[in-house]
Amino acid sequence: RLELRGVDVGARWADLATYLKPRVREHLSAFHDVHYLYGLARAGERSAVTEMLASLEDRAARAKPFERELWADCVVPLAHGLAAHAAGDMSTAARLMGQAMPYLRSLGGSIAQRALFGAIHLDALSRAGWNDAALAILQADERERPGVAATKRALAALYHRLGRTEQALAAEYQAEQLARHYRQAVTRTGEAA
């Protein structure tokens, strides 16, 4: 999440890879598998990523009837999309992750945990230039949770790219108002303690 917001995370991915490599064929949880795969991909562990993708495809082929849809429609395309994102192939990432997104809930995890995949998908859409799809997602997010400054900032950036200056400025203003409100609330809470 930090990298998606422009923060340099240094060698943290490489540090994680040490713990992730032994889990390439584990498959105890599809939810964990896709996280492991993304960590390996971000660490640049190409051979481990290739091995894990093949192992995930094999696991999908052996899925029991009740889990076939999860593996075929969510896990495999999501894993390939995450690998593509880490490799910088944003069009492939956007396409494959887009296939998986409708099935994401069946993967498990909390809403906040699954939101990471939504953020990566949105990043892929934006960086691939699929602005209409990115805009639709951001507008839906804004309707669902209108008080999130980060969504307003993302909308502002996209509106700027689309040449919609008036909408961009409005979104920037709303983001700043929300951020100011949150900072004041934190200050008041700190003073009360």
Annotate each predicted stretch with a short phrase.
Residues R1-A193:
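Helix-coil-helix junctions within alpha-helical repeat/solenoid scaffolds
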